[in-house]
Amino acid sequence: MNPPPPPSSGHWFESDPLWFKKAVFYEIHLRGFFDGNADGSGDFRGLTEKLDYLEWLGIDCIWLLPMYASPLRDGGYDIADYYQVHPDYGTIDDVKTFIEASHERGLRVIADLVMNHTSSDHPWFQRARQAPAGSAERDWYVWSDTNQKYEEARIIFTDTESSNWTWDDVAGAYYWHRFFSHQPDLNFDNRDVQEGMLDVLRFWLDLGLDGFRLDAVPYLFEREGTNSENLPETHDFLKRV
């Protein structure tokens, strides 16, 4: 799944498929960068205004931290809608304008994307928890009648989480989460989930993004008798990306 190259500007990386190995990246948290509409939050309009400065720095690629619609309980890594940006940061049209202006300057743009889990506010999870057990909607997440499965998987946030399972009263079942309990893991054993995530990638690549830093990908699959990290199934899926 390769994005189209940005318009030619004479940059060395335009003919190099491994451009990212030598590129200078500039990581940006939109909220703290530059406020383009004086509402107290950095945004895409402000970032676009500062592109001449970023070009002057001599960077090759802008790396955006999560900018998607989110309740922001984990800095935007809890995504509630993969197809929208957080309203504090602007609109999809603002993103398109920013990407086009970046490409005009020979700058590439990548973004963090969380594939392993969503926010518990995501419509996918809300549908799943309300759907009957065994239904296609329920199967988008990892559920269990017991919290004793996958016990060899470590708890990552031991200061806040006592288990990788959390009981959901609406579903009447436990759901799996490798991170915070408000970030349920998607079920990548479900082919529909895989295709849904590939659709997300296509959407942003079609919008003009040049790539992604895929967050939390070691944890996409779970298997008994393993630590459920970096499994062969994960590598097989990533080959499709």
Residue ranges and their predicted role:
Residues 2-190, 194-198, 206, 217-241:
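Acidic/aromatic-lined carbohydrate-recognition and catalytic surfaces
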